[in-house]
C-alpha cells in the first residue's frame, strides 16, 4: 500500500512541476513561413495609402475572370466588325471608297467604348453591391486612395486592351482581304506616323472613356443606373444631335464624345465651333474633370459621415 501511495505522490509532483514550467515558460510561437517574412505586414502598413491601394486593386484585377471575359467578347466583336466592314467597303464601295488604316480598326472605335463601360461599371460597383467595399476599408481606411487606384488601373488596362484590339483588327482585316484576293494594301498605313497618330487617338478615347465611366459610377452608386446613364448618353443624347443642323450646332460642339472621336471620324469642320486640337483637349478636360469631381465629392461625403 505504501508503495502505491509513494508512486502516486511522485506522479502528482511530476505533473505539478510540468504545469509550473509550462506556465513560467509559455510555448514558443510558430516561426513564420519563409515565403511570408514577419516584417512583410509591418512594411505594408507603413506604405503610403495610394501605393497600398494600387497593390490591392491590381491583385483584384488579375483574378477578375468576369472582367476578362467582358473585354474578350468586346475584342471579338470589334475585330469581326473591322474585318467585315472593310471587306464590304472594298467590294461594294466602288471608286468613291477610300479605305485606309483607319478602316481596318473601325470596330475598335465603334464597340470598344461600350464594352469598356460595362467592364468599368461592373468592376467599380460590384463591391458596393456585395458590401465588400466596407470590408476593404477596415484594412485601408482611405476611400480616396482606393478610388484613385481603381481609376489608374482601369485606365492602364483600357489603353492596353484597345491597343490589342487595334492590332488584332488590323491583322485579321488584312488577312481576310488577302485570302479573298482583295487589294489589302489599300488598308495599310502610308507611314509609321499614321499608326502613331492612330495610337494617340486610341489612348485619348480610352482615357476619356474610363474617366467618364468612373464619374458616372460614383455619382449613381448603382450598377443598373450607371449602365443606363452611360448608354443613354452616348447612344441617345449624343446620337440624336447632328452638327449639320445649325440650330443645334452649339450644343453639338459641347458634346464630349463627339469631340473625342472627331479626329477619327473626321466630320466637316463647320460642325464644330473650334478646331480638332481644341476638341481633343475639351474631351479630356470634361471627362477627367468629371471623374476628379466625383472622387472629391465622394471623399467629402465620407468625411461628413465619419
Regions from the PLM with identified roles:
Residues 4, 10, 14-37, 282-306:
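Junction motif at the cytosolic side of a transmembrane helix
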Residues 38-46, 67, 71-123, 147-220, ...:
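Secretory targeting signals
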Residues 60, 125, 136-138, 213, ...:
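Helix-capping/transition residues at the boundaries of transmembrane alpha-helices
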Residues 120-139, 144:
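Transmembrane helix boundary and interhelical loop/hinge segments in multi-pass membrane proteins
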Amino acid at each position: 500500500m505504501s508503495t502505491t501511495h509513494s508512486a502516486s505522490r511522485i506522479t502528482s509532483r511530476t505533473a505539478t512541476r510540468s504545469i509550473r514550467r509550462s506556465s513560467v515558460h509559455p510555448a514558443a510561437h510558430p516561426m513564420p513561413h519563409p515565403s511570408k517574412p514577419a516584417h512583410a505586414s509591418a512594411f505594408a502598413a507603413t506604405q503610403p495609402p495610394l501605393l497600398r491601394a494600387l497593390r490591392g486593386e491590381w491583385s483584384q484585377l488579375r483574378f477578375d475572370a468576369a472582367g476578362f471575359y467582358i473585354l474578350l467578347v468586346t475584342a471579338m466583336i470589334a475585330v469581326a466588325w473591322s474585318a467585315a466592314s472593310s471587306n464590304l467597303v472594298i467590294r461594294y464601295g466602288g471608286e468613291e471608297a477610300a479605305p485606309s488604316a483607319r478602316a481596318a480598326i473601325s470596330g475598335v472605335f465603334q464597340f470598344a467604348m461600350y464594352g469598356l463601360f460595362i467592364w468599368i461599371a461592373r468592376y467599380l460597383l460590384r463591391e458596393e453591391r456585395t458590401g465588400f467595399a466596407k470590408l476593404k476599408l477596415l484594412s485601408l481606411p482611405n476611400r480616396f486612395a482606393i478610388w484613385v487606384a481603381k481609376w489608374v488601373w482601369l485606365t492602364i488596362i483600357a489603353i492596353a486592351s484597345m491597343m490589342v484590339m487595334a492590332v488584332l483588327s488590323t491583322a485579321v482585316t488584312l488577312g481576310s482581304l488577302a485570302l479573298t484576293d482583295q487589294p489589302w494594301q489599300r488598308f495599310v498605313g502610308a507611314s509609321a506616323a499614321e499608326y502613331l497618330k492612330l495610337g494617340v487617338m486610341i489612348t485619348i478615347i480610352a482615357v476619356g472613356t474610363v474617366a467618364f465611366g468612373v464619374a458616372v459610377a460614383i455619382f449613381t452608386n448603382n450598377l443598373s443606373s450607371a449602365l443606363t446613364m452611360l448608354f443613354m448618353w452616348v447612344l441617345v443624347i449624343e446620337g440624336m444631335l447632328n452638327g449639320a443642323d445649325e440650330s443645334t450646332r452649339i450644343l453639338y460642339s459641347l458634346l464630349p464624345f463627339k469631340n473625342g472621336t472627331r479626329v477619327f471620324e473626321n466630320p466637316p469642320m463647320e460642325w464644330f465651333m473650334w478646331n480638332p486640337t481644341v476638341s481633343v483637349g475639351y474631351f479630356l478636360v470634361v471627362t477627367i474633370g468629371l471623374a476628379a469631381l466625383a472622387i472629391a465629392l465622394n471623399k467629402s461625403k465620407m468625411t461628413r459621415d465619419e
